[in-house]
Amino acid sequence: MRTKQILLAVLLVGSAVSLGGCVVAAVGAGAAGTVAYLKGDLEAVESRKLDEVHAATLKAVKELGLNVTKDSKDALSATVVARDAQDKKITITLRATTEQTTKLSIRVGLFGSEAKSRLIYQKIHDHLQK
């Protein structure tokens, strides 16, 4: 499990370096998994089951006062679509990569907002720690 996280971190950093200018990558260790902001999407990996990450996502969205317009989930993936006070569309996509690991993708608006994406991710991550 730990080997997979390290490999994923190396791949994300390698991708970020090879793609150049408009990429900001941050690689965390331990429970935080890996996080990268790439082309308007914040992508992260959490060492938690899809159901847990989905529940944390809904709590985070509610805590931030976002209006959920779509919430769909099956055994392998989930999508939460919300709108903020400026009516920007926020799409949070979750994919189970293993039984115990979930990949998140957060996009705010058409072009993305790194600051808002990171805030949403941090709230989701905080709820996973409770």
Model-inferred region functions:
Residues 8, 17-21:
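C-terminal motif of bacterial Sec signal peptides marking the signal peptidase cleavage site
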Residues 1-8:
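Bacterial N-terminal signal peptides that target proteins for export
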Residues 1, 21-23:
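Absolute protein N-terminus
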Residues 13-14:
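Repetitive helical segments and hydrophobic/amphipathic motifs
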Residues 23-130:
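Ser/Thr-rich, low-complexity intrinsically disordered terminal regions
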